[in-house]
Amino acid sequence: MWIPISLTELKECISHAELKLDGESLNFWNLIKIPPQKWKEKEYGNDGGGFWAVAVFGNTVIFYNDIEDGFNISSYAVYGQISEYASEQAELNWVVERIYNSLKQNAQL
């Protein structure tokens, strides 16, 4: 079993990522971020008490997978429950910029 990341360590990761965001991406992050909270995930999340959710946009959640040491995107149907396990090892700023750029591209269509 892995040792889940502490809230203090997670906040350090978030702060580090925020320093890499600027302009519209940072504004977008400030709109979607939430205080970190544990969300349930049925496949792998039980052992660690869930995964830390850090942002919500529509029916999408950004969460930290501390098994794989990276931020991930999932849909959700019930607030507090991650629908799809994901195991990317992405930095938070990459995930935020990916979502933001995807929204910008779709808005221009």
Residues covered by each model-derived region:
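Amphipathic, interaction-prone secondary-structure segments
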Residues: 30-70
